[in-house]
């Protein structure tokens, strides 16, 4: 179920202050964040956010299509290496 419209989008206060400061200074360095639950807002477009995936920070360049999604959707946490092939089937 989506979030109620009367509540508005959720974004951590510390991340919002970093985004506003970077937009004010036209700073292009990545903003490190552990807040995967924060929603992408229109004032984040054009910024690079380094989102933590549990092991490292993944750089995410925000564009217009990402607005309204959560940051965690763009930093994959699970690595799929494929199914193990059967040795008999290879011959």
UniProtKB/Swiss-Prot annotation:
Keywords: Ribonucleoprotein, Ribosomal protein, RNA-binding, rRNA-binding
Gene Ontology biological-process annotations: ribosomal small subunit assembly; translation
Coiled coil: none
UniProt cross-references to PROSITE patterns, sorted A to Z: RIBOSOMAL_S19
Pfam families tied to this protein: Ribosomal_S19
Membrane spanning residue stretches: none
GO molecular function, one term: structural constituent of ribosome
CC terms in the record's Gene Ontology section: cytoplasm; small ribosomal subunit
Role according to the record: Protein S19 forms a complex with S13 that binds strongly to the 16S ribosomal RNA.
HAMAP family: Ribosomal_uS19
Family: Belongs to the universal ribosomal protein uS19 family.
Record-given protein name: Small ribosomal subunit protein uS19
Organism: Saccharophagus degradans (strain 2-40 / ATCC 43961 / DSM 17024)
Gene (name only): rpsS
């Amino acid at each position: 179920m989506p979030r109620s419209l009367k509540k508005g989008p959720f974004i951590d206060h510390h991340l919002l202050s970093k985004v506003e400061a970077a937009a004010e200074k036209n700073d292009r360095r990545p903003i490190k964040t552990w807040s995967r639950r924060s929603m992408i807002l229109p004032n984040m477009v054009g910024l690079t956010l380094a989102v933590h995936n549990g092991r490292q920070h993944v750089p995410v360049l925000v564009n217009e299509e990402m607005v309204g999604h959560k940051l965690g959707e763009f930093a994959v946490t699970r690595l799929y290496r494929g199914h193990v092939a059967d040795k008999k089937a290879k011959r």
